[in-house]
């Protein structure tokens, strides 16, 4: 047994060396630096930060490089590193209407206080390969408009709330749970649901959000507002007793305006779904908002008609680190289990053969 263990250990070490060599690739090609990943593969970095649960572009870039571009593996690496970090303080609640806007659009109102800002997007490209990028030419810098954007842009939902078109959502003062410290239970609070959706796999949430548009829990959404920009993060240390600004982060927020409800007390009003992610992960924020609203079906006495409305199904299968780990464990030796099933199958075949002989 000792020889087998040592032999396996050497094989694993060699496999890791081969993987590192494969990651490096052709030595005649310049090695990809973490700064290049962080600056030029920003959307991949944003996804890894969001689902990994750490806002650190450099660490996310390192994880992507170490994982050879496998984003799920990179998310796993970042999650593992996160568990080693001390918890120094809790930040104060972010006021996203104070965001320094980079992009802001609405599909429900053309004219907004503060205006709409198209910002950087692939939305209107023709999805044709740009072969000039193969020439390694320098991309010209985009022109900048000197016109200053408003420092504070009110949310579309805040305007709808003032008009009585949407219900006001207020903080009840309760301490939000922390899913990284407490195992989630079902039914979950909305705070716990949103935390799990943020860390959930983008592809999984995108598919669920798409399913709600195809009749599996239809809730008729409109993109009320999508905004991307920089926001200051503050903490209030007990020893100081006042707020201090510790930096700023890039966020994308999405609020979906959903079909109105008449089931609750008061006048009919629109409902909302909410998504908030690190960086410019706009598609993830939209999918998160769609699924968030779908999971509110019990709150509005709506019939559960699709998988996106099944809270336990959605939340217990959204985490790609957990899912990848369970699927990947099938690669580990299952010799004893298989031998047991093989012996059972042989006995069953023998019984069938005996019956046929009779």
Regions found by a protein language model. Give the residues of each.
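Acidic, serine/proline-rich low-complexity intrinsically disordered regions
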Residues: 143-358
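Short, amphipathic alpha-helical interaction segments embedded in low-complexity terminal/linker regions
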Residues: 1-228, 242-244, 354-358
């Amino acid at each position: 047994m000792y020889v087998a263990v040592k032999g396996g250990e050497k094989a694993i070490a060699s496999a890791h060396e081969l993987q590192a060599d494969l990651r490096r690739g052709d030595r005649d090609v310049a090695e990809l630096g973490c700064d290049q990943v962080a600056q030029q593969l920003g959307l991949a970095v944003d996804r890894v930060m969001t689902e990994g649960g750490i806002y650190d572009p450099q660490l996310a870039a390192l994880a992507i490089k170490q994982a050879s571009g496998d984003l799920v593996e990179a998310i796993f690496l970042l999650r593992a590193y996160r568990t080693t970090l001390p918890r120094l303080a809790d930040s104060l609640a972010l006021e996203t209407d104070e965001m320094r806007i980079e992009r802001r659009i609405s599909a429900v109102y053309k004219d907004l206080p503060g205006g709409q800002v198209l910002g950087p997007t692939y939305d209107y490209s023709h999805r044709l390969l740009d072969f000039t990028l193969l020439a390694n030419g320098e991309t010209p810098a985009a022109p900048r408009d000197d016109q200053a954007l408003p420092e504070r842009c009110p949310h579309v939902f805040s305007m709808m709330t003032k008009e009585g078109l949407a219900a006001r959502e207020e903080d009840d003062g309760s301490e939000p749970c922390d899913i990284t410290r407490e195992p989630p239970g079902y039914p979950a609070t909305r705070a716990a649901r949103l935390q799990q959706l943020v860390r959930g796999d983008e592809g999984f949430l995108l598919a669920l959000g798409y399913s709600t548009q195809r009749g599996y829990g239809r809730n008729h959404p409109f993109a009320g507002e999508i905004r991307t920009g920089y926001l200051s993060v503050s903490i209030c240390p007990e020893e100081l007793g006042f707020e201090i600004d510790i930096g700023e982060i890039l966020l994308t927020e999405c609020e979906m305006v959903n079909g109105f409800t008449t089931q609750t007390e008061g006048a009919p009003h629109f409902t909302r779904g909410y998504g908030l992610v690190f960086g410019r992960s706009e598609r993830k924020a939209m999918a998160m908002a769609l699924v968030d609203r779908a999971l509110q079906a019990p709150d509005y006495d709506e019939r559960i008609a699709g998988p996106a409305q099944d809270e336990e199904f959605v939340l217990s299968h959204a985490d790609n680190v957990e899912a990848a780990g369970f699927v990947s464990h099938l690669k580990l030796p299952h010799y004893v289990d298989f031998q047991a099933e093989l012996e059972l199958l042989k006995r069953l075949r023998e019984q069938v053969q005996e019956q046929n002989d009779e």
